[in-house]
């Protein structure tokens, strides 16, 4: 079963366009962007600007990739509450994880509201991630091409707006199993991670495909999800390549049509 977001998070606005030198009035679909807060134990941990869709998946994926939980069962409940112009996503953790997060907060220098949440030092920004070197997984080159194409075809929000990022999980045997979209590339990947975990999909036997460049955080989040192959339409950063190499992740970038470039663990790709 394909797990696809069907929540529309865009509006139509008036605009004036210039077409071949001639102005014309009309409408354009633009994505919504609202503040989304994640609260644990009644305290706000982070605030992101995000698309207001798939917030349960977002909460699970964010909690996982930021190291707040290590498995889905460590979240007892999630409630999404409207708060002014945005949403407060209230996450109820098990006692052990709640205690660990409180201890982590006591050492934080100040409030956080960005991609690297709860980070106290430069060393933590380049954090240790799971080593997937031993994961026995291989895919064909045409699977990489198919994964990116399937993601592009399934991006309903981007088709309307041409303004959002997408992240998808592709299994060579079953096709595209999950796709999530957001105005932020990190958010899209967190939402995908949550969708995969909530659906009970094994991340080890597939490909994470994204429509953005490959920064180090995208590699870190993919490693924590447990997927050994990450593919993108844009180029990677040097640190992303180094991190993927250490984590045993096959990093494929610049996927355009049937062309792509492999930067790490090329042995997993059957050409």
UniProtKB/Swiss-Prot annotation:
Cellular localization per UniProt: Cytoplasm
GO annotations of cellular component type: cytoplasm
InterPro entries on file: Cytidine_deaminase-like, FdhD
Superkingdom in the source lineage: Bacteria
Gene Ontology terms for molecular function: sulfur carrier activity; sulfurtransferase activity
GO biological process: Mo-molybdopterin cofactor biosynthetic process
Keywords of this entry: Cytoplasm, Molybdenum cofactor biosynthesis
Active site, renumbered: 114
Family: Belongs to the FdhD family.
Function as written in the Swiss-Prot or TrEMBL entry: Required for formate dehydrogenase (FDH) activity. Acts as a sulfur carrier protein that transfers sulfur from IscS to the molybdenum cofactor prior to its insertion into FDH.
Name of the protein in its database record: Sulfur carrier protein FdhD
Source species: Agrobacterium fabrum (strain C58 / ATCC 33970)
């Amino acid at each position: 079963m394909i797990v696809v977001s069907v929540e529309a998070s865009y509006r139509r606005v008036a605009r004036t366009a210039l077409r071949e030198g001639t102005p014309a009035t009309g409408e354009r679909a633009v994505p919504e962007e609202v503040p989304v807060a994640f609260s644990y134990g009644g305290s706000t941990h982070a605030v992101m600007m995000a698309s207001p869709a798939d917030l349960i998946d977002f909460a699970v994926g964010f909690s996982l990739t930021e190291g707040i939980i290590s498995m889905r069962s460590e979240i007892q409940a999630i409630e999404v509450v409207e708060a002014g112009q945005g949403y407060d996503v209230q996450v109820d953790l098990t006692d052990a994880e709640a205690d660990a997060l409180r201890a982590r907060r006591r050492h934080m220098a100040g409030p956080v509201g960005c991609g690297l949440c709860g980070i106290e030092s430069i060393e933590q920004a380049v954090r240790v991630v799971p080593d997937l070197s031993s994961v026995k997984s291989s895919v064909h080159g045409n699977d990489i091409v198919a994964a990116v194409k399937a993601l592009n075809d399934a991006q309903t929000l981007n088709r309307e707006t041409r303004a959002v990022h997408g992240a998808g999980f592709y299994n060579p045997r079953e096709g595209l199993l999950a796709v999530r979209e957001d105005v932020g590339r990190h958010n899209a990947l967190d939402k995908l991670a949550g969708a995969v975990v909530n659906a009970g999909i094994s991340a080890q036997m597939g490909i994470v495909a994204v429509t953005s460049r490959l920064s180090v955080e995208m590699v870190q989040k993919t490693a924590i999800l447990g997927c050994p192959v990450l593919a993108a339409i844009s180029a990677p950063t040097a640190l992303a390549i180094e991190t993927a190499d250490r984590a045993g992740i096959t990093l494929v970038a610049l996927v355009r049509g049937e062309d792509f470039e492999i930067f790490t663990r090329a042995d997993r790709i059957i050409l």
